[in-house]
Amino acid sequence: MKRFNFLILLSTVLISLFPNRALADIGGLTKCSESPAFEKRLKASVKKLEQRMGKYEAGSPPALALQQQIERTQARFDKYSRSELLCGTDGLPHLIADGRWSHAAEFILPGFGFIYISGWIGWVGRKYLRAVSTTKNPTESEIIINVPLALKIMTTGYIWPISAWQEFISNDLVALDEEVTVSPR
């Protein structure tokens, strides 16, 4: 019995140390450069713009604007086809956020950008509310925004991670338990 337990333990350790990699495609997605639906979408977009351009005289401002839009559309599709983005059956690029490092650029930079900007907005809002709470009529200042004060606070908000860390260290970021009101139930 001890030998059997040892073999089970050994096989479990070996399986957990050397797992087989499962290399499956990601939900039927293909590289955009190899996707027929992606090419079809490009042709349909360009054709639609060319039909609109046919309604105007060559060289007229609307025709020139549509020609520029066609060039931008082709450049966008070309950029997607040169990248490692994967397209679905609809021909649209899909972002993969499953932890694979090969798709990190698709999600990490936009994700950090979103977190930074939303943190900036939240930090500036918090700082504004704390600043107007010391005025003689704070409720009115919350409804009717003091634009010069708000702009001043917004321009300093880009360093919100440093400010948040400093307030966290000085115990000014989190309210004390005595300051938090609890409604009786």
Swiss-Prot record:
Specify the superkingdom: Eukaryota
Q: Which UniProt keywords apply?
A: Chloroplast, Membrane, Photosynthesis, Photosystem I, Plastid, Signal, Thylakoid, Transmembrane, Transmembrane helix
Entry annotated with the keyword DNA repair: no
The signal sequence is 1-24
Give a Gene Ontology cellular component term annotated to this protein: chloroplast thylakoid membrane
Q: What Pfam family does this protein match (any one)?
A: PSI_PsaF
The way this protein sits in the membrane is described as: Multi-pass membrane protein
GO biological process, alphabetically ordered: photosynthesis
* Compartment(s): Plastid, Chloroplast thylakoid membrane
Q: Where does the protein principally reside?
A: plastid
Q: Where are the transmembrane segments?
A: 104-124, 143-163
Q: Please name the Gene3D superfamilies in this protein's record.
A: Photosystem I PsaF, reaction centre subunit III
What family is it from?
Belongs to the PsaF family.
Described by its record, this protein's role is as follows:
Probably participates in efficiency of electron transfer from plastocyanin to P700 (or cytochrome c553 in algae and cyanobacteria). This plastocyanin-docking protein contributes to the specific association of plastocyanin to PSI.
What is the name of this protein? Photosystem I reaction center subunit III
Organism name: Trieres chinensis
Lineage of source species: Eukaryota, Sar, Stramenopiles, Ochrophyta, Bacillariophyta
